[in-house]
């Protein structure tokens, strides 16, 4: 009986130690966007449009920080890779003349076109939410458009 008790206690201790090391990272990582460096969106030499693709996943945009040039058109391809959860893309700043709100259904792709005229840093986010649960923005689905 003593050997079984020791093995059982050792097993429980091992599980608790593993959870104390890996558990917080697993829980924290569930709702946070992956760390991706800012994307400098290139200007197409043929038509002058700045094009980028943003992947919408479970509560994240990738990339979540884009750098564009003021006064040049921007075209964003918003691609949802979720199978059930719909998302949206909101980029609103009245002073900068930005008012974009597009729904992106699960597994769908939509295109957003605009021309940012005023340099600055502008947040974009998803405001979808289910009942009393936190919104997608509250779960980390937000990003930054940096206009230079």
Which role does the model predict for each range below?
Residues 79-106, 132-143:
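Histidine- and aromatic-enriched segments that form or immediately flank copper-ligand environments
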Residues 43-73:
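N-terminal edge beta-strand
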Residues 53-55, 75-77, 90, 125, ...:
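Soluble periplasmic/extracytoplasmic beta-strand elements of cell-envelope proteins
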Residues 34-46, 104-148:
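Extracellular/periplasmic metallocenter environments
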Residues 51, 73, 84-88, 121:
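Exposed beta-strand and adjacent loop surfaces of beta-rich binding modules
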Residues 56-58, 78-82, 116:
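Non-cytosolic beta-sheet module surface loops
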Residues 1-53:
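Extracytoplasmic entry segments of secretory-pathway proteins
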Residues 63-66, 98-103, 112-113:
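Beta-strand-rich interaction surfaces with strong enrichment in secreted/lumenal proteins
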């Amino acid at each position: 009986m003593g050997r079984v008790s020791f093995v059982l206690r050792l097993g429980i201790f091992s599980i608790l130690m593993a959870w104390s090391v890996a558990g917080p990272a697993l829980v924290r990582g569930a709702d946070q966007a992956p760390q991706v460096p800012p994307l400098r969106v290139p200007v197409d030499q043929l038509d002058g449009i700045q094009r980028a693709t943003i992947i919408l996943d479970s509560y994240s945009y990738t990339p979540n920080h884009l750098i564009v040039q003021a006064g040049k058109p921007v075209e964003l391809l918003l691609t949802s890779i979720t199978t059930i959860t719909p998302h949206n893309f909101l980029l609103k700043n009245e002073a900068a003349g930005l008012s974009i709100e597009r729904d992106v259904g699960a597994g769908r792709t939509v295109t957003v076109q605009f021309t940012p005229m005023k340099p600055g840093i502008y947040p974009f986010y998803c405001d979808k939410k289910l009942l009393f649960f936190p919104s997608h923005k509250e779960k980390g689905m937000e990003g930054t458009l940096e206009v230079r």
